[in-house]
Amino acid sequence: MQQAAEFSQKIKYFFSFERIFILIFIIALFVRFWHLDLKLLHHDEAIHAWFSYELLTRGVWVYDPSYHGPFLYYVTAGMFSLFGDSDLIARLLPALFGTLLIPLVYCIYRLGYINKNQTLLAALLLALSPEMVYFSRFLRHDIFMVFFTFLLLVAILYYFEYGQTRHAIIAAIATGGALCCKEEMPVILLIFALFFIYAVYRGKFTLPHDWKYDLILGSFIVLTIMSVLYSAFGAHIDTLVGQNFALNTTGWYKAIEHWIAMHNQQRLGGPLYFYIPFYVLYEVPIFILAIIGTLQLLGKEFNPSLFIRRLKNRIQYFRSGVPTDELAAISLQQLKNQDTVHSKSDVFFGFCVYWMILVMIFYAFVGEKVPWLIIPQLLPMCFVAVYKLNWQKMVFAIVGCLFLAVMTWHVAFIPADINEPIVQVQNSEDLREVMRLIDASDHVVVASKNYWPLPWYYRGERWNKIKFYGDIVDEPTLTQDNPGVIILYDAASYPSIEGYDKKTFKLGYWFSYYDNENRLIDYYFHRDGRMGSINIDVFTPQIAS
């Protein structure tokens, strides 16, 4: 009996809350960093890496809203300076920032907003979420913005809890960092501001005595960070004040103008429910638990039985003339019986539901719809999913994590072209063979309007052996220097070139709904089928027999 008790104590010690949380952190670390350069850079990643390389080698960066804010470029250029320029180094910081979401969950726990089980499950969902993992291994601005958003939330909650200026400073740094990532961050700030202003008004939070001083200090920090980075450390002041102080030439005016145009144009448009299939494809357990959590919380906020009893009391008052004070006493007793007093946890989860719903509505409305915009929606969803966590939901979540793990493995760790919407337009693994041919040649001709990511992979002096034409040219021009490789866009190519063998490769590929719309259920379980692609024709000299 004593041995059994000792064994039980050892098991409890080994599987303590802290040890399990550290294990989850290690899992998050592993799935984000392992084989980080397994796949070629995505089209957008290659552009971001190229701009960062240009910033490092030529000191050139000017704000262009098409390519978002400066934070990514400066930190990536810094990594290239320290460790060299490569696919692996380009993805290190996104992986790090994606991993650091996990410790921030622990910060929420330390403040008492979530219990131990909720902490472990929320951390596990963030650690294994296929889309969180995929876009943490991806050189885009979104994972940086998500991290800063979460850091801002933690800093705000700590500020309300302890009232210390240092937490206001952290909140300001997080805000400045997020605003230097992407142009939709002001909308997220507005969502946060409306809730917390209302919460303070209702007495859910109390502002410290020196909050006005902290607000001024924080605003100064935010403006300083943005001014320094957006002006390229003063090299492009016109981004801030405009050319000759013309309002319509400022960076923020151009950003608003550009993204309103993109919204109206719907260049990458989609229906309002665009992101729902992504939840069904990759995040089913999180999505289902979040729906249940939302219904539970909203059901608590609006209790039908309590409403009916109050209505009966009101009718009784008009019919029988019950004194007002007696009616108030009856309603008060019913209110107490229903336990409608909001706990600290309820305020937090109420915020998460509000945050999740509004951010989902915002991204559903925005005309530009792309897979990576799902991760700002997933962040609050992972917390809503752990609301009122009982053993049934816990079992469902643990089993569901097996699904998340399998999908994470499928989308992130299979070194092949995968027929998945998450990839958007991914550079094909076929390019590895194309680049082997380029590496083996002393002279290469590229006559195609579709050629990325070649400028990234042949940056610097490596580009010297490549003669580039923006579009197809005549055969004599292509062959005048006897190139070892000729690359043409297959839709604007030649059936053959004398003296050369021709082979077609995929340049980039994407999931094609139209090629799979009649077999969606079959596709869901097999994840196969026909893909859309952009192709290139590669001509190499014929080998004499």
Where are each of the predicted segments found?
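Membrane-interface transmembrane helices that cradle and orient dolichyl/undecaprenyl
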Residues: 8-11, 110-113, 152-168, 197, ...
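Transmembrane signal-anchor helices characteristic of membrane glycosylation enzymes that use polyprenol
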Residues: 17-42, 220-236
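Short hydrophobic alpha-helices at membrane interfaces in multi-pass membrane enzymes
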Residues: 19-22, 117-123, 155-176, 351-356
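Transmembrane-helix motifs of polytopic, lipid-linked glycan transferases
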Residues: 26, 92-113, 151
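Membrane-proximal lumenal/periplasmic loop motifs of glycosylation machinery
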Residues: 35-43, 56-77, 81-91, 259-266, ...
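Short acidic/glycine- and proline-prone juxtamembrane loop motifs at membrane-interface regions
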Residues: 42-43, 94, 131, 137-144, ...
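Transmembrane-lumen/periplasm boundary regions of multi-pass, lipid-linked membrane glycan transferases
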Residues: 48-53, 68, 82, 159, ...
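Specific aromatic-rich, kink-prone transmembrane helix
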Residues: 53-57, 100, 104-107, 125, ...
